[in-house]
Amino acid sequence: MIVIGFDPGTAITGYGILNKEDDKIAVIEYGALTTPSNWSIGRRLNYLFDQVSSLLDLYNPDAVVMEEVFFNKNIKTAISIGQAQGVIILAAQQHQREVSILTPLEVKLSVVGYGRATKDQVQYMVKEVLKLKDIPKPDDVADALALCISYIYKQEGC
């Protein structure tokens, strides 16, 4: 099962692609889709759509996962995350894929075992579970990989 996870934003969208086969979780690819701050919102969203579509074409994932938008004190940030989420959902829909939405609590519980885990604890567990040399950077990438791990564990009933 190939799972792609996204931590959306208009400036940086982290992504991770994992393959679950038998009892093993293997990293296929991970990275960040970034846009210059001087680009218009339309140009940023168009670029994000094209890049997400390319990843979906290339890897043909069985599942697409994103984190639920949480309440953010900065309304501008919350709106920009929502716009990026909409673009990812549209790209997935055009590839006949539904997007599974996980809450931060679900991700922390499944990856760390504690719903109030810190970002550092989640990132450490991502590194350990995937047997990576270093914690993926930027944080958005580690978050996207955590979403994939959480989705896989959820499918296994963990």
UniProtKB/Swiss-Prot annotation:
Primary enzyme class: hydrolase
One Pfam match: RuvC
Residue positions binding Mg(2+) 2: E67
EC number(s) per entry: 3.1.21.10
PROSITE patterns linked to this entry: RUVC
Gene3D superfamilies: Ribonuclease H-like superfamily/Ribonuclease H (3.30.420.10)
Catalytic activity of the protein: Endonucleolytic cleavage at a junction such as a reciprocal single-stranded crossover between two homologous DNA duplexes (Holliday junction)
Cofactor(s) of this protein: Mg(2+)
Cofactor: how and how many bound: Binds 2 Mg(2+) ion per subunit.
InterPro entries xrefs: RNaseH-like_sf, RNaseH_sf, X-over_junc_endoDNase_Mg_BS, X-over_junc_endoDNase_RuvC
Keyword Membrane: no
Binding annotation for Mg(2+) 1: D7, D140
Compartments reported by the entry: Cytoplasm
Entry keywords, A to Z: Cytoplasm, DNA damage, DNA recombination, DNA repair, DNA-binding, Endonuclease, Hydrolase, Magnesium, Metal-binding, Nuclease
Active site: D7, E67, D140
Cellular component terms (Gene Ontology): cytoplasm; Holliday junction resolvase complex
GO MF assignments: crossover junction DNA endonuclease activity; DNA binding; magnesium ion binding
GO BP terms, alphabetized: DNA recombination; DNA repair
Family: Belongs to the RuvC family.
Role this protein plays: The RuvA-RuvB-RuvC complex processes Holliday junction (HJ) DNA during genetic recombination and DNA repair. Endonuclease that resolves HJ intermediates. Cleaves cruciform DNA by making single-stranded nicks across the HJ at symmetrical positions within the homologous arms, yielding a 5'-phosphate and a 3'-hydroxyl group; requires a central core of homology in the junction. The consensus cleavage sequence is 5'-(A/T)TT(C/G)-3'. Cleavage occurs on the 3'-side of the TT dinucleotide at the point of strand exchange.
Subunit-structure text: Homodimer which binds Holliday junction (HJ) DNA. The HJ becomes 2-fold symmetrical on binding to RuvC with unstacked arms; it has a different conformation from HJ DNA in complex with RuvA. In the full resolvosome a probable DNA-RuvA(4)-RuvB(12)-RuvC(2) complex forms which resolves the HJ.
Protein's UniProt name: Crossover junction endodeoxyribonuclease RuvC
Organism in which the protein naturally occurs: Dictyoglomus thermophilum (strain ATCC 35947 / DSM 3960 / H-6-12)
The encoding gene: ruvC
